[in-house]
A protein has these predicted regions:
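Short S/T/G/P-rich N-terminal loop/turn motif that feeds into the first structured element of a domain
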Residues: 6-7, 18-84, 92-99, 125-128
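Intrinsically disordered, low-complexity segments enriched in polar/charged small residues
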Residues: 10, 37-38, 102, 111
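Alpha-helix boundary/capping residues
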Residues: 11-14, 55, 72, 104, ...
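Surface-exposed, polar helix/loop patches in the mature regions of secreted/periplasmic/lumenal proteins
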Residues: 86-128
C-alpha cells in the first residue's frame, strides 16, 4: 500500500525528467559551410571521383567537422551555372571552421583541386 502512495510521486518525477530531456533536444545553431564545385571540361571522371573521395575523407581527418554530406546536382531549373557538386560541412563554432580552413588535410585538398575547377562558390551561414 505504501508503494501505491509513492506511485504518483514517481510518475511526476518521470514526467519532469522527460520534459527536461525534451528541452535538451531543441536544435542548436550550427555553422554550415556550403561548397559548390563545377569541374573543368578537361577533368576526367576518375579525377572527379578522386576529389569526391578526398572531400569525403576530411571529416575523419579533421575533428572540428561535426557533420558532412554531399551530392550532385539534380535540379531541373537550369540555374546551376556550371556547378555540379555540393558539399555541406557543419561546425559548432567559427573557431572550429577556422581550424578546418588551415588544417593540413584541408590545405592538401586545396592543392588536389587546384586547376581542376571551372567554378567554385563557398557560402557560410548560421542556422536559424
Amino acid at each position: 500500500m505504501k508503494n501505491l502512495k509513492l506511485l504518483p510521486l514517481f510518475l511526476l518525477i518521470c514526467a519532469l525528467s522527460f520534459a527536461c530531456c525534451e528541452t535538451d533536444k531543441q536544435p542548436q545553431k550550427v555553422l554550415r559551410h556550403v561548397v559548390l564545385f563545377g569541374f573543368d571540361s578537361t577533368v576526367t571522371a576518375n579525377q572527379v571521383k578522386e576529389i569526391e573521395e578526398a572531400f569525403q575523407a576530411l571529416p575523419q581527418q579533421i575533428e572540428e567537422i561535426k557533420g558532412y554530406e554531399w551530392g550532385t546536382d539534380c535540379s531541373p531549373e537550369g540555374l546551376q551555372k556550371g556547378l555540379t557538386h555540393c558539399f555541406l560541412v557543419t561546425f559548432h563554432s567559427e573557431k572550429d571552421r577556422d581550424a578546418y580552413l588551415i588544417h593540413p588535410a584541408h590545405q592538401a585538398f586545396g592543392k588536389l583541386i587546384n586547376g581542376k575547377l571551372s567554378a567554385i562558390t563557398v557560402v557560410d551561414y548560421w542556422t536559424k
